[in-house]
Structure formats: C-alpha cells, structure tokens
Amino acid sequence: MSKKKGKTPQPAAKTMTASGPKMEAFTFGEPVPVLDRRDILDYVECISNGRWYEPPVSFTGLAKSLRAAVHHSSPIYVKRNILASTFIPHPWLSQQDFSRFVLDFLVFGNAFLEKRYSTTGKVIRLETSPAKYTRRGVEEDVYWWVPSFNEPTAFAPGSVFHLLEPDINQELYGLPEYLSALNSAWLNESATLFRRKYYENGAHAGYIMYVTDAVQDRNDIEMLRENMVKSKGRNNFKNLFLYAPQGKADGIKIIPLSEVATKDDFFNIKKASAADLLDAHRIPFQLMGGKPENVGSLGDIEKVAKVFVRNELIPLQDRIREINGWLGQEVIRFKNYSLDTDND
C-alpha cells in the first residue's frame, strides 16, 4: 500500500522584529478666545432692590464695548469734541465736566449732573456723576452713587439732573441709539483679536508636512518636530534646514491647506462691520480722517461737516439745554459751529 503523501508544511510567519514607520501628526496654535458680550442685552426690565432701579442693560458692558472697534469709539469722540468746542464755559460748569457729561450721554444714553452747595446752601458748581455708577432711586428725585453694591450713597433729593435718551420700553433710564450695532462692534473686535492671536501664536503653518522618505529615522523626525514647534510665538519667521542623504525628490512634501485670508474673511468682516457702525452713529467717514471705499476724493468736507452738525449736533445741543430749565437760569450756552479757527 502506497504511503499517503502529506501536505507540505507551510513555513511559519516570521515575527516582525522591527516596527514599521508610523504616521505622526501634531497641531499648531492654541484655542483663541472669542469675546461675546451679548449678556449686556439680557436684562428684561429695570429691577428694583427697594432703594434704586437697575438699568435695563449693563452699563459695565457698554463701557467695555466702547473700545471694541475703532468705528464705534471714534464717532462718539468726534461728536463729543465738536460739542465741547462749541460750549461756552460757565462758572458753575467747567469745560472738563461738560465733556464728561456729553461722553456719558453718548455712551450710556444717560448723563447725570449734580449740584454742589456751599456751606450757606447756595449752588457753587455742577459736577458730572459718572453714569456707569449712578442709579435712579425708587423715591422721587432721589439718585444713588453705587460704585459697588456694598458702598451705596444716596444723593440729596433734587440735587441730580438726569438727561436720558428715551426708550420705548421703560421711562426710568435711557438707552444709547447705537445698541442695534453692538453685534457689529463685537464681530469687528473678534476678527481683530483672532488675527492678532494668529500672528502672536506663530501658527502660520497652514500646511501639512508629508514625509515618506525611507532614509529618515525616528531621531530625524523628532528633531524636525521639535524645531517646528519651537518656531511658534515671537520671532517665528525662521528658516528650517533639513539634510536628507539619499532622499527622494518627493520624499518630503509641503501641502498647503489654504490661505488664512480665505478662511476667516478678515477684510470683508472689517468693512461690513465698520459700515454698520458708521450707519448707526450717522457720522460721515471723512470727519474721522478716513476715505470712503471706491471714491476718488473726499468731496467737499466743509459741506459734509455743516450738514452733519445741523442734523446731529444741533439737536444734541437742544437736549443738553434742558439743564437750564432744571436750574432756572442759563448755564448751558453754545457758540455757532465754525470751521474758521480765526473766529474762535
């Protein structure tokens, strides 16, 4: 009987003695904080604590937002400066206090003026009480100075004048006209901070370094990784030297991801948000030292300034003159606006 032919035994699989090359990935950059102050608009009413009413929006939030964007703060300061230039100082009210009063009104939609008395009970001067910390009292003609909740001080009844920008929802506090443009101011600020953080981080890589060259060992990869990570931060624009003997032409590839300009749309965001802010403040771009887009010249700036003063500043002067009715005498006076400095 013939012997059965056994199957030829298969050789055992060889055990891998060395691990193959591994893919390695690491990231650049750090989380970027994004400012969002929508909480200043979350108040629904003027809440009373028994002594004073809280404002319908956060005055602290409005104060922080003042410098959120160039096209938000600059129009306010332009209006303040023009008004201050036409104000005629009075023994009771200095130029400085008037400027503070106007700035408070433009930023917060509220401005407070306090009577200061002599020892004989006569009014000797008027001082601006910062609107950020001044509150309307529950009792009539009573106002409170509240720099902190634990240190409130009541003003003498009838000693504080309150100028407010009327609101359609309540009559206790005013609201600034620019509230609808605050989201544009915050967007403008967020875009600027994102771009600034981008450059400070030095995370400008925007590419994938794809290494397939077999001659690279682990030490080479680690050294390359460390040098690239060290290139972040200040002085990050550095040259990187890499020596790869017997390397292939395509052993190391740089694959760009995309330009950051197309990712965050920085310039379009800045332009759109700036236009919103200028529309909200209703101030010509030329009066802030800028030039409108797609316009060859600034036009007749003198005519622009006169129209702006007639439509915006004269109504503000009339509002501020309400102080005279409260005092019973003419303390607030203005001279005519003129571009001719020889007439000052």
From Swiss-Prot:
Main localization (coarse)? virion
Q: Name one GO biological process term.
A: symbiont genome ejection through host cell envelope, contractile tail mechanism
Give the keywords, sorted.
Capsid protein, Viral capsid assembly, Viral contractile tail ejection system, Viral genome ejection through host cell envelope, Viral genome packaging, Viral penetration into host cytoplasm, Viral release from host cell, Virion, Virus entry into host cell
Q: Does the keyword Amino-acid biosynthesis apply?
A: no
**Cell compartments where the protein resides:** Virion
User: Which Gene Ontology CC terms are recorded?
Assistant: viral capsid
Q: What this chain does, per the record? A: Forms the portal vertex of the capsid. This portal plays critical roles in head assembly, genome packaging, neck/tail attachment, and genome ejection. The portal protein multimerizes as a single ring-shaped homododecamer arranged around a central channel. Binds to the terminase subunits to form the packaging machine.
Describe its assembly: Homododecamer.
Looking up NCBIfam families in the UniProt record yields: portal_PBSX
Family membership noted in the UniProt record? Belongs to the phage portal family. PBSX subfamily.
Q: What is this protein called?
A: Probable portal protein
Query: Which species does this protein come from?
Result: Escherichia phage P2 (Bacteriophage P2)
